[in-house]
A protein has these predicted regions:
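Self-splicing inteins and homing endonuclease
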Residues: 46-75, 121-151, 163-166, 184-221, ...
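C-terminal structural cap/anchor segments
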Residues: 221-279
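Single conserved hydrophobic/aromatic residue that forms the stacking wall/gate
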Residues: 1-8, 13
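Short, recurring structural edge motifs at helix starts
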Residues: 26-29, 71-74, 100-103, 144-146, ...
Length: 295
């Protein structure tokens, strides 16, 4: 029995093994949409028996003994599905092709591809046909590897810089990071901060005039920072548009709704736009209890 955290690649590998594995999860993970990945695994030869709701945890996974060498995957709900297939493709016995539909989160997929290359596995990418090819008998090489700091978490500290008008530095974070969330620093620069990449980490200095600039940004390639930007948006001198984030409704909770509800409780004016939110400057912030939605 397995309790998953980042379960996608784990399931793909189990699909190719000879055993049967029962995978359970937290109540919150049971709500996460998994259908696109699980359908792809079934087409690759997985046999899945669901304990409760179809295409959701918990379930038992084994294999039918029949294997395909091509699979289609849609990434509109989560790019993790594609990353899982890429990472685990080395267990396939033939050249393996993954055909991709959708464009969400491809910066995270590129991070996966580059890390695989660092471990000696160069995934071929056919951009014309939007597919990835992993050669048969591919294997990872062992090596000593320095893991980058979590840029998603680092962004919280960088966001404090314009709010508190202080210098913020996170050790080990650099502009050449594989992680797409490093693009959030470009947003802070647009808002008036000064960003400098020093030898031991990136420094964020607050706006010189203490004014945080408003504007509109497409966060489709680093959507984890939508909540971070939403938290500082009420303190900007003009409205802040957060675009390209419609897919975050399908994560551990409806994160667009979570942003809107909590900011409204704080006295902030928020409007839903086609694929995101517009947040207006707040004259004052009202005390309230912040709902976390078990996220």
């Amino acid at each position: 029995e397995i309790m998953p955290s980042l379960v996608g690649s784990e399931m793909c590998i189990r699909d190719r093994s000879k055993g049967r594995y029962h995978i359970v999860s937290s109540e919150q993970m049971k709500k996460r949409p998994m259908k696109d990945l699980l359908v792809s695994l079934e087409k690759l030869g997985a046999h899945i028996e669901y304990d409760e709701n179809e295409y959701h945890f918990p379930f038992t996974i084994g294999n039918t003994g029949e294997y395909a060498d091509t699979v289609d995957i849609n990434v509109d709900k989560s790019s993790q599905f594609l990353s899982a297939l890429l990472i685990s493709a080395i267990v396939m016995e033939k050249n393996f092709t993954i055909n991709v539909t959708g464009t969400h989160g491809m910066a995270y997929v590129e991070m996966t591809r580059l890390m695989m290359k660092q471990f000696g596995l160069d995934v071929m990418q056919d951009k014309k046909n939007n597919s990835f090819i992993i050669p048969k008998k591919a294997a990872y090489e062992s090596l000593d590897y320095d893991i980058e700091p979590d840029v998603s978490a680092a962004c919280y500290f960088y966001a404090m810089s314009p709010l508190l008008h202080v210098k913020s530095k996170v050790m080990g974070v650099h502009q050449n990071s594989l992680q797409g969330d490093v693009a959030f620093l470009d947003v802070l620069a647009d808002m008036g901060c000064t960003i400098s990449d020093e030898a031991d980490g990136i420094v964020c200095m607050p706006p010189k005039n203490a004014h945080i600039h408003g504007g509109s940004w497409d966060l489709s390639t680093f959507s984890d920072q939508a909540l971070t930007l939403a938290a500082i948006a009420p303190f900007a001198n003009a409205p802040v548009g957060i675009e390209g984030i419609s897919h975050i409704r399908l994560q551990e909770c409806d994160r667009i709704n979570a942003i809107e509800e909590n900011l409204t409780e704080l006295g902030v004016r928020v409007e839903e736009i086609e694929n995101g939110l517009k947040i207006y400057p707040a004259e004052r912030i009202k005390p309230c209890k912040i709902k976390t939605y078990d996220d």
